[in-house]
Amino acid sequence: MQHGMKTTPFDRIELDDDTRKHFLRTMMRIREFENRLAESYLRGMTAGSMFHLSVGEEAAAVGMGSAMRNGDYFTTHHRGHGIFIARGADLGRMFAEVFGRIDGYCKGKGGSMHIADINLGHMGANAIVGANIPISLGGGFSMKYQKKAAISVAFFGDGALNQGVLYESMNMAALWKLPVIFAVVNNQYGMGTRIDHASASLKFAERAETFGVRGVEVDGMDVEAVWKASHELFEAARRGDGPGLIVANAYRFYGHGRKDPSPYRNKEEEEMWRLRDPIDTYRTRLVETKVISENYFDQLGKTVKEEIDNAVEYASTCLAPEDEELYTDVYASEGK
């Protein structure tokens, strides 16, 4: 059951006005979800002590997520709410999960950093930096083995770009020509370390060339630019042309976690990036090109807020798991 506006996995390949409205609506849903999650955390409504928000990165999540198709697999890192919503997640069940309730996607056991739903192709979020990447490799191997015209996408941040497992996985994906996409959201910081203090070279897309893998870099604050680059790369992998790497350069408006006040960033930098807010700039573009009106945007904002209100209310009424749930979903059932 959906709790609010009906959402199904986006599965279109035309960049028309309906698609543009979908981009805007989905970015707004992600933003409102995460802002409400931050508020719920401060009110003590959530289970768990750490949340990693992707406010500011919505264009990257929606652009890449909307280039996927039904039947594709994906994994995410610890900052993965946006991509899951972009793939059609039920917001009521998402809130229930982070509130630690039985009706959450993982019965309240996974929380923010370990949410999953195989029905939507989500093989799981992962709190260990880079650990989700080889899991997506397995998904890609499965697709090729079964001769499916589908892809497997590993979403991760710039903090994983220096993890050895990424390059082991990239080598294997290239060697076996697997339909795997390595999708990076570069938000400029790994926790509190600026990216140029952690990487000797910032030409991340070029790293893929060592393995004969196509690599592209894109403005991660421009949803259409992200979608176009992703669509081309994803469809090539779907055709059997092998893996690809996409790097979407963006910025997180919050700190690493909700408790982080970002003392390592200066106000000028933050203000510069906020002027490129992906929702504000896209709204302006769509109004100027007459795809939407200001009234349309205002009404959409009210609709999204109402949807989030309903989702939070639903999650708040869900029950906590019984003690016996500690012993379920631990081992595979016999014969499976």
Give a label for each model feature.
Residues 1-60, 248, 258-336:
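Conserved acidic/glycine
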Residues 5, 81-83, 221, 302:
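Intrinsically disordered, low-complexity regions
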Residues 7, 11, 34, 38, ...:
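Membrane-targeting and insertion segments and their boundary/processing signals
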Residues 7, 113-114, 213, 217, ...:
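Generic preference for hydrophobic/aromatic residues in regular secondary structure cores
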Residues 8, 13, 22, 27, ...:
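Mixed-charge, polar/low-complexity N-terminal
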Residues 35-38, 45-176, 194-200, 205-212:
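Cofactor-binding active-site loop characterized by glycine-rich and histidine/acidic residues
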Residues 84-86, 192, 256, 325:
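Short acidic, gly/pro-rich beta-turn/loop elements at beta-sheet edges
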Residues 122-317:
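Glycine-rich ThDP/TPP pyrophosphate-binding loop and its adjacent helix/strand module
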